[in-house]
Amino acid sequence: MDTNLAYAMAKIMKIRNVGDYSRYVGHTDRHPLVSVIDYAEVSPVRHSLNNYSVYGIFFHDEAEIDLAYGCGKYDYKKGTVICVAPGQIGGKEDNGEQVMLTGWALLFHPDLLHATHLEKAIKNYSFFDYRVNEALHMTDEEHDIFVLLMRQIRDELQKRPDELQNAIIVGYIELMLNFCQRFYNRQFITRKLENSDILMKFDSLLRDYYEEKTQLTLGIPTVQYCADKLCMSPNYFGDMIKKTTGDTASNYIRQY
């Protein structure tokens, strides 16, 4: 194995279950499949670059963290939400530094969703496949809603387990995901100027593609191809085009 590759792999922490992350930050779980962490109670914490086998929703209130991702750098600031899904890698490599954080993290294992409506429905929340530089920036009101839901899930976890506990927790998680989708919809609307600029770059990309006759060798450009050229994830790019034009990115390409 390449030495640099082996070193990079050694720096990635595998989060196979919620307990792996909780133990790293010094949090004690009350449930094997779901964890709610108030960072104010465990700080200071070290950075970690994680390979997730669980779902995670993270937001911080104060800390500013530079994360390298994709085509540039991203400043993780107050009121920013990042969602991760199993199979994804995210975070910042441990460099020995300890940081004071205030904010919350919700992690839950896919097994928690087994035989529930959310088991299949979670695939509809495309923001789990957004890049970190496409994160949600919350308003103060949206932030308060997220904190309230985090506390409600935590309160439920502190109760004596019964046959309805998992269903109630999954219900809260689905409610949080729906609010997250609503907040993203608001963000797409409030970023009309930025989205218009991306749309112009999209048009320019398609124009150059056909003027250079690239379609003769590669065929019709795909959403993945266009998103990569614009340094965006396919899901965020597709959602942005849909919100901006009312049409899907694939239809927009075909009709160009």
Give the location of each predicted region.
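Short acidic-glycine-tyrosine-enriched beta hairpin
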Residues: 71-85
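Histidine-centered metal-chelating micro-motifs
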Residues: 82, 87-93, 113-114
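An amphipathic alpha-helical interaction segment
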Residues: 144-204
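Short helix->loop/beta-hairpin flanking segments within DNA-binding domains
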Residues: 204-219
